Amino acid sequence: MAKSYTDDDVLVIIEKCNINNTNKQYKKTVKLIKPLLSSYNFNDINLKILILDGYLQALIELDLIEDIYNVTQELIQLDPLSKNSNNNKYFILAQIIGGKKGIDLYLNGINNITNSDKIIECYLSIVDIYMTDLCFEVDAEQQCELYLNKSLELNSQNFMVYSYLGSFKISQQSFGNALEFFKKSWSLFNENLGSIDMDKSKILQYCYNLIKFLLELGDLSLIDSILSYSKQLEDDNIEGLYLEGFYNYLSLKMKLFNINNNVDINYSYTPDQFMENEMNVHILNYNI
């Protein structure tokens, strides 16, 4: 027999769930809310919004994607202006769905916020979609430029925007410009280090992505400093160790290639030289 609940019971559950989530006891939150949602008929829609909002927080931490998908959809229907729930529901669902529907969700969510850093984050996520899911759309390139420019208009000193600009320029095969944007990104990152509000995992991913792009362009000049900083955050990260190994491998390959071609051992190539005529392939295939 299903348990019966009163409005007072619901209020108590909301309070308990807030405590559970604060203490990172997310499974307890799910255990409290699941039976409530299956048997209680909410007369007060705001109570349901509060319940679903707390439930969503726990589901995200437990990575229960199917439930996250269903709850975010319901929350958007019940509270489209995010008056009583976290507006991130739009962006979470957008990440799950992707494509044109994902872009619509990002834009709808942006309408509810004024924080420029968060808006830029959403614009860059839209650029991501156009560079992946929608890369074959006829206007994909124009849309990328549009949202990158919108991001710069909001904050021309945002280091992540320049990282995305570099990636976009690689897709256009404008390799020299790409390198300049990556250098600008790393410079801005260091200049604003004290005020950057990002999770350690996101900062590490930024560092690792930047290293990958620089390796792709054959420019090793910044990689030591990026690796040094990332090691301060986490010195035994598998991805970081792999990238450091590949960096040393490529550096040695380039030196041997230079020696074999009677060029100064430390000669460095421009991105255009490195990518031209598959020189990068010749260097990587050179026997040690």
Residue ranges of model-derived segments:
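N-terminal leader/linker segments that initiate helical-solenoid repeat arrays
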Residues: 1-50
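Flexible helix-coil transition and linker loops at the boundaries of alpha-helical arrays
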Residues: 2-3, 37-48, 74-86, 110-120, ...
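Amphipathic alpha-helical repeat scaffolds of TPR domains
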Residues: 8-14, 47-53, 57, 83-101, ...
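Structured C-terminal portions of repeat-based eukaryotic scaffold domains
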Residues: 25, 179-288
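Alpha-solenoid helical repeat scaffolds
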Residues: 27, 31-34, 73, 107-111, ...
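General structural concept
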Residues: 30-80, 86, 90-93
